[in-house]
Design a protein with these regions (language model features):
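Short, conserved alpha-helical segments within structured domains
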Residues: 98, 138-142, 166
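Generic detector of short alpha-helix boundary/capping microenvironments
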Residues: 18, 65, 134, 151-152
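A short, Lys/Arg-enriched amphipathic alpha-helix from helix-turn-helix/homeodomain DNA-binding modules
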Residues: 135-158
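Short helix-to-loop capping/linker segments positioned immediately adjacent to catalytic or ligand/cofactor-binding
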Residues: 110, 130-136, 160
Length: 172
């Protein structure tokens, strides 16, 4: 079977069952709440910590095995959260290492409910770190990027041109 055939078949089945993935803007409201450190808003989205977690139509089905499906969704979520938090000023190496730690912890879990509980823990951890960062840092994203570059190149000869963020790559 071809991918196109599979795609058309699945889209047809979803239309027949009247199911669809979570709306894009709703998904990013959630991710932006994490990145802005809004723990109150984020808590509204907590995962039910039971064996039905990740099984709703809005999540999509990544595997027929419920535990593997939960694991795949966890990895997708932590990858997106990591990148959005970096985009909003979290130090890159901290974010990626935190992501690695959570994925390694998830890899040892044996039930969907354990994965869901770790998912909630991971979301709270990233959200609180972003909240703390916003309170502590009065630096612009440009200064944060320069600090990150300098930290990563402590043993290299630093040049201003390499540190400077070009206007077209500027992040607001």
């Amino acid at each position: 079977m071809s991918i196109d055939h599979d795609l058309h078949q699945m889209l047809f089945q979803q239309r027949e069952a009247q199911t669809q993935h979570l709306e894009y803007n709703q998904e990013f409201q959630y991710y932006n709440a994490i990145a802005s450190g809004d723990i109150e808003n984020v808590s509204r989205y907590f995962m039910k910590e039971d064996d039905q977690a990740y099984s709703g139509d809005e999540y999509g089905k990544l595997s027929g095995d419920s535990l593997r499906n939960a694991r795949y969704h966890f990895v997708v979520a932590v990858a997106l959260i990591t990148r959005i938090c970096v985009e909003h000023g979290m130090e890159r190496e901290t974010a990626y290492t935190l992501s690695d730690i959570f994925i390694q912890k998830m890899d040892h879990l044996q039930t969907v409910s354990q994965v869901a509980a770790l998912h909630n823990t991971m979301v709270v951890d990233f959200t609180k770190r972003m909240q703390k960062q916003k309170k502590e840092n009065a630096y612009s994203i440009y200064v944060m990027r320069a600090i990150e570059y300098i930290s990563a190149h402590l043993h290299d000869k630093l040049q201003i041109a390499a540190i400077r963020l070009p206007r077209q790559q500027a992040v607001t």
